[in-house]
């Protein structure tokens, strides 16, 4: 039942029941729906939302009707904090849970935790058999919805180069379908997730895959308020160039310019990424 949440949004705007339901349904039916006594057809609900100037995306976000998996607060705390012993303990607990119930969402959460550990320690704690299962799930995705894109992005450091590139290209080919949903959040998580994937490819010196993905992401038409991703793509291109020719001046100049613009957090992130790539280059003699 979610009619009462519609009622709250209607009243906030000073719209009467009569105004809201005119030409859509009877006032008595709207009243019963708003009091959670009956349900209404999907088309009726959409028309009522349109009448009070609320999109379906907004309603799903504001209401409790939107289905959200319940996440253990301990998992959220482990993901947010860089307390390695605590993170490892929660990760093992989550893996044990998945091994008992084989629930796909629990595997995604375990992979998310392992991804965080990989970022900190550069070690993959997800067992090989679970890695295989995880990628098998993504390889069978036909419609890359927000659910799957988020799950892939939250575990992207756990995959090998071919897997990162293959799934990333599937997502990019699905862009037009995602745009039909009219939500820029999908574009945001795509750009963020695949940028992480490109960084992972660069760190493995898989520059051909990385270059192809940068080229494809640059083709995506972004709304103005997401144009900051063009800066990240520029950074990633300079990172690729650095790995090829060892000239660090262009990438350090860009980081300095970002800092001069007052974007200290982003500049620090870029610098940390560069230091990691530099260490990788030295370690593996790329």
Regions of interest found by a model, annotated:
Residues 1-12:
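A short, Lys/Arg-rich alpha-helix, primarily the initiator
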Residues 5, 73, 109-117, 150-154, ...:
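"A position-specific structural signal for the A-helix of alpha-solenoid helical repeats
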Residues 14-31:
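Short alpha-helical DNA-recognition segment
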Residues 43-58:
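DNA major-groove recognition helix of helix-turn-helix/homeodomain DNA-binding modules
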Residues 55-129:
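Charged, helix-prone or intrinsically disordered regulatory segments positioned adjacent to compact structured domains
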Residues 64-72, 101-110, 144-151, 181-192, ...:
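Alpha-solenoid helical repeat architecture
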Residues 92-99, 133-139, 172-180, 212-223, ...:
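Amphipathic alpha-helical segments of tetratricopeptide repeats
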Residues 96-203:
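Mid-protein regulatory/catalytic core that forms ligand/cofactor-binding pockets
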């Amino acid at each position: 039942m979610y009619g009462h949440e519609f009622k709250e949004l209607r009243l906030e705007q000073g719209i009467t029941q009569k105004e809201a339901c005119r030409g859509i349904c009877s006032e008595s039916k709207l009243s019963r729906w708003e009091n959670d006594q009956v349900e209404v057809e999907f088309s009726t609900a959409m028309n009522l939302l349109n009448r009070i100037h609320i999109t379906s995306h907004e309603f799903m976000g504001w209401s409790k009707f939107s289905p959200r998996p319940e996440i253990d607060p301990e998992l959220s705390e482990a993901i947010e904090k860089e307390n390695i012993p605590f993170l490892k303990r929660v990760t093992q607990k989550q893996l044990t849970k998945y091994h008992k119930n084989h629930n796909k969402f629990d595997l995604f959460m375990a992979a998310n935790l392992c991804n965080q550990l990989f970022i900190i320690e550069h070690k993959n704690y997800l067992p090989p058999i679970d890695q295989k299962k995880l990628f098998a799930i993504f390889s069978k995705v036909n419609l890359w919805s927000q659910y799957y894109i988020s799950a892939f992005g939250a575990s992207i450091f756990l995959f090998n180069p071919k897997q990162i590139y293959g799934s990333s290209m599937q997502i990019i080919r699905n862009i037009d379908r995602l745009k039909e949903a009219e939500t820029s959040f999908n574009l945001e998580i795509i750009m963020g997730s695949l940028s992480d994937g490109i960084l992972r490819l660069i760190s493995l010196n898989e520059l051909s895959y990385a270059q192809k993905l940068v080229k494809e992401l640059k083709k995506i038409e972004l709304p103005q308020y997401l144009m900051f991703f063009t800066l990240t793509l520029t950074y990633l291109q300079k990172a690729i160039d650095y790995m090829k020719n060892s000239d660090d001046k262009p990438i350090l100049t860009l980081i300095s310019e970002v800092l001069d613009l007052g974007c200290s957090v982003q500049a620090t992130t870029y610098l940390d990424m560069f230091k990691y790539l530099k260490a990788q280059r030295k370690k593996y003699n790329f």
